[in-house]
């Protein structure tokens, strides 16, 4: 028989790394075409003008310009990029 009792191991003591989501370029910032503006899960922020959406719902700029966050309706936000004039 064992002289010492075997050490138990814990099963639930793991965590995944953070996904680095969120706003990458804020309102008023100058962006180039292709710059990522927001990384998100689902469409927390919707598309405005001159922005595109990747398959993981990442919003990116289609033109060089300035980022502007706007209200789409009562409880939805959108982000647009307008050419710097």
Curated annotation (Swiss-Prot):
Pfam family, any one: Ribosomal_L27
The entry's keywords: Ribonucleoprotein, Ribosomal protein
BP terms from Gene Ontology: translation
Domain of life from the UniProt record: Bacteria
InterPro entries (alphabetical): Ribosomal_bL27, Ribosomal_bL27_CS
Gene3D superfamilies tied to this protein: 2.40.50.100
Gene Ontology molecular function, alphabetical: structural constituent of ribosome
Renumbered residue ranges of the record's region Disordered: 1-23
Cellular component terms per the entry's GO annotation: cytosolic large ribosomal subunit
Keyword Ribosomal protein part of the UniProt annotation: yes
HAMAP family tied to this protein: Ribosomal_bL27
PANTHER family noted in UniProt: LARGE RIBOSOMAL SUBUNIT PROTEIN BL27M, RIBOSOMAL PROTEIN L27
Family stated for the protein in its record: Belongs to the bacterial ribosomal protein bL27 family.
Protein name (record): Large ribosomal subunit protein bL27
Organism: Aliarcobacter butzleri (strain RM4018) (Arcobacter butzleri)
Taxonomic lineage from the root: Bacteria, Pseudomonadati, Campylobacterota, Epsilonproteobacteria, Campylobacterales
